[in-house]
Amino acid sequence: MDQNLSGLDCLSEPDEKRWPDGKRKRKNSQCMGKSGMSGDSLVSLPSAGYIPSYLDKDEPCVVCSDKATGYHYRCITCEGCKGFFRRTIQKNLHPSYSCKYDGCCIIDKITRNQCQLCRFKKCIAVGMAMDLVLDDSKRVAKRKLIEENRQRRRKEEMIKTLQQRPEPSSEEWELIRIVTEAHRSTNAQGSHWKQRRKFLPEDIGQSPMASMPDGDKVDLEAFSEFTKIITPAITRVVDFAKKLPMFSELTCEDQIILLKGCCMEIMSLRAAVRYDPDSETLTLSGEMAVKREQLKNGGLGVVSDAIFDLGRSLAAFNLDDTEVALLQAVLLMSSDRTGLICTDKIEKCQETYLLAFEHYINHRKHNIPHFWPKLLMKVTDLRMIGACHASRFLHMKVECPTELFPPLFLEVFEDQEV
């Protein structure tokens, strides 16, 4: 090693030397021949790669004067010299390097591949540190450590972000309390719905079937059973709305439009959160457990599929009473319902509920990634269910006997925009 490095002092020697036959030896040595052409290309092509901000524009490599790419092994070098130095140390190649011209070749970006010994000696001379080159095991360990640190920083940033998310203010907590209580006092059977539900008999559907225009059949017996619970279900939605702050301040006309628009959406939500994966049923109005086909044949058709699918997806969210209540408030205060007068006021009301809702979600700290935007997508799903039901209702009204429709059911769902 010391022998190979003994010629370092001649790197700065300017004198030209002669061969024994008197011919001059050029400083830009051509001593490598074909055997030295491996490695970098003779001229490094310009690269559009990343250049650190601490480098000056076009700062040269201290070894070969090519364009530097960063601080490598304690020196500012190009990628070629960095790789050459690393390979030399990792594979312990320097003891085998030799120079045909007494170790005095000038190294630049054109000649750097022509003499490995002189290039390596210059790397050492300018200060490149051999001890900073890692062997394979150390390199793997370093990469593992870097990845572990990266994961740790991500986790710390996530925790910091969660801690920085605002939670409800005192005014919002009061609003949340009122909305939650409004839901609990108007939600049939409350948390005891599983114990108190009754399953619709599986043999229901033996009565004559009325044909629907879209090819589906309406089981009149099932339809009759559903209409028995629809009036109290609608009444509970109305009672919920009346208990909400800001709703009573709206005009009577706007209140009616909002209630008609959201009624099916809120009833669908209340049914969906009572989806039971074990029995594959929804519990309607807190008392009647029905299967998908029963609800479908009872008049809802494809709307039944949408409500059941919503129930299955909501099961993963593990919503509490407050989250269900705030979802209902957001659905109620939809300023895009046709015919509204005070749209700006209603929009501000919805924004107030949405902000309190978001802050409450921050407080709950769910483990589901992007919980808040995913939950808001359920509002869109419920709006679609409401629109599909409005279309379905027109068919039901034509095909089913009028006497089967409760007056409140007709009052709420007639004249809805499809």
UniProtKB/Swiss-Prot annotation:
On whether Transmembrane is a keyword of this UniProt record, the answer is no
Question: What CDD domains does the record point to?
Answer: NR_DBD_TR, NR_LBD_TR
Keywords from UniProt, A to Z, are:
DNA-binding, Metal-binding, Nucleus, Receptor, Transcription, Transcription regulation, Zinc, Zinc-finger
Q: Which ranges of the sequence are annotated as binding DNA? A: 61-135
Stretches the record annotates as Disordered: 1-38
Listed InterPro entries: NHR-like_dom_sf, Nucl_hrmn_rcpt_lig-bd, Nuclear_hormone_rcpt_NR1, Nuclear_hrmn_rcpt, ThyrH_rcpt, Znf_hrmn_rcpt, Znf_NHR/GATA
Can you cite a GO biological process for this protein? Answer: negative regulation of transcription by RNA polymerase II
In residue numbers, the region (Modulating) covers 1-60
Places the protein is found:
Nucleus
Zinc fingers typed NR C4-type, residue spans: 61-81, 99-123
Which Gene Ontology cellular-component terms appear in the entry?
A: nucleus; RNA polymerase II transcription regulator complex
Query: Any further remarks?
Result: A number of compounds can compete with and disrupt triiodothyronine (T3)-binding including 3,3',5-triiodothyroacetic acid.
Q: Which PANTHER family match?
A: NUCLEAR HORMONE RECEPTOR, THYROID HORMONE RECEPTOR ALPHA
Known role = High affinity receptor for triiodothyronine (T3).
Under what name is this protein listed? Thyroid hormone receptor alpha-A
Q: Which organism is it from?
A: Xenopus laevis
The UniProt gene name for this protein comes to thra-a
